[in-house]
Regions:
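A conserved ligand/cofactor-binding region detector
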Residues: 1-234
Length: 234
């Protein structure tokens, strides 16, 4: 089935590359940073009418995304901005990776052999559903084909075993900001729970602990474990 997007906000991601050299090394690593830029032109009509704040606000909403990384999240506005930032950085990086890969090889058929994405803690865990989205919605992969690629590309490092320290997102806020990504996570969770039921029939406590979605929360660590070919802890 085809997916159409409605009532979305378009943001341009502008890359800034920092070259990092090592001691006695002939190679240079690249650290790519991203800036969010609004795609709409400055509204001169509003400005000419004296609506200065509104004219500026229309172009500054997108730029807030990369203005201050990870603001306070003790209120819903902060949580939504933090979620937006995580998605922005993940999506921009993945689109850059795929564009570079296609430029080099002309096909995504060997993506899993040429690309490795490591989730170091859960902040970039949205790369899992976002890569699924790109493969399915943009390149017409089936679910099974896209999942096969994702689970061969992604690995994960977990940094804590304390349940209260593991990153989770409220389902309501998640659906509000990233509806398509939530749809994909829902399907990941459904398939995971079905597999867990086959392995542990009747053990609802175990399955509920391992599920990606539970108690109105999206559990990013569980998502990372479910989609990674390798997991380690530090």
């Amino acid at each position: 089935c085809s997916i159409s997007y409605e009532n979305y906000e378009t943001v341009r991601a502008v890359p800034y590359d920092m070259m990092i050299s090592g001691a006695d090394c002939k190679a240079v690593s690249v650290l790519r940073l991203w800036k969010a830029v609004d795609t709409t032109n400055f509204n001169m009509n509003l400005f000419s009418q004296g609506q200065y704040v509104k004219a500026i606000q229309e172009t500054s909403n997108a730029e807030v995304i990369s203005k201050v990384l990870y603001p306070s999240d003790d209120h819903d506005e902060g949580k939504l901005l933090r979620l937006t930032q995580q998605y922005f950085l993940v999506s921009a990086s993945l689109q850059s990776i795929i564009a570079d890969h296609l430029a080099a090889y002309g096909t995504l058929g060997n993506l899993a052999e040429k690309v490795a994405i490591h989730i170091n803690d859960t902040h970039p865990a949205l790369c899992i559903p976002e890569l699924m989205r790109i493969l399915m919605d943009v390149y017409n992969y089936s679910w099974e084909a896209a999942w096969s690629v994702v689970t061969r590309v992604v690995s994960y490092t977990n940094h804590t075993v304390l349940p209260e320290a593991l990153e989770t997102w409220n389902v309501y806020l998640f659906k509000l900001r990233l509806p398509r990504i939530y749809m994909i996570i829902e399907e990941i969770n459904r398939r995971l729970c079905a597999d867990l039921w086959n392995m542990y029939p009747g053990d609802w406590d175990r399955i509920s602990r391992m599920a990606v979605i539970g108690y109105s929360q999206v559990r990013m660590a569980n998502l990372s474990v479910a989609a990674s070919h390798t997991v380690n802890g530090v």
